[in-house]
């Protein structure tokens, strides 16, 4: 009935917006296509790379205290965990031709359910224009930018995110209950 997304792009809006700036932000997607090397390097020193990603890209250091970073590192250090994480990006290329025909059709169908897109306006991985271009593909869309938040908006600004979610769910439930 409703959809809530935090800093996750609609793929058509992502493709439409893709230019040099987004390419530079998405370099890691291409790096992850190399077999075994990314997970090997990311796993060195107890998955220190995972900690560095969160430490260097968040805008509110208190959201990622050392004990939270350690949980991410421990989880990433488990057997097969880094490969699974990186395979998310590798899957973009596998089966693309078979899926492309179906996706192309589906990606042009508008999303018609009430949707809330919460977006940190200082995301280092995704251009803000991707969020604004999502209106082309979602007919009932509310975009809420959180100033000074990064890609990790739900960790950095959880109070604001929770309030936005509560307001959205309450409002859309009220509208759904109104007689037509």
Give, region by region, the residue ranges found by the protein language model:
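Flexible "cap/lid" subdomain of the alpha/beta-hydrolase fold that forms the substrate-access gate
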Residues: 1-145, 166, 171-173
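Catalytic active-site module of serine/aspartate enzymes centered on a nucleophile-bearing elbow/loop
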Residues: 140-180
């Amino acid at each position: 009935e409703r959809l809530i997304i935090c800093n996750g792009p609609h793929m058509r809006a992502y493709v439409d917006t893709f230019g040099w700036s987004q390419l530079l932000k998405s370099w890691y997607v291409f790096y992850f296509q190399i077999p075994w090397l990314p997970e090997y390097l990311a796993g060195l020193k107890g998955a220190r790379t995972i900690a560095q990603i969160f430490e260097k890209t968040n805008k509110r250091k208190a959201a990622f205290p050392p004990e939270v970073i350690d949980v991410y590192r421990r989880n990433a250090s488990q057997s097969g965990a880094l490969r699974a994480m990186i395979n998310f990006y590798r899957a973009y290329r596998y089966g693309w031709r078979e899926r492309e025909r179906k996706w192309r059709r589906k990606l042009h169908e508008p999303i018609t359910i009430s949707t809330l897109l919460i977006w940190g306006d200082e995301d280092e991985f995704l251009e803000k224009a991707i969020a604004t271009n999502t209106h082309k593909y979602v007919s009932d869309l509310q975009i809420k930018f959180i100033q000074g938040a990064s890609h990790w908006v739900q960790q950095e600004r959880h109070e604001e995110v929770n309030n936005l979610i509560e307001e959205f769910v309450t409002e859309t439930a009220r509208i759904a209950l109104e007689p037509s």
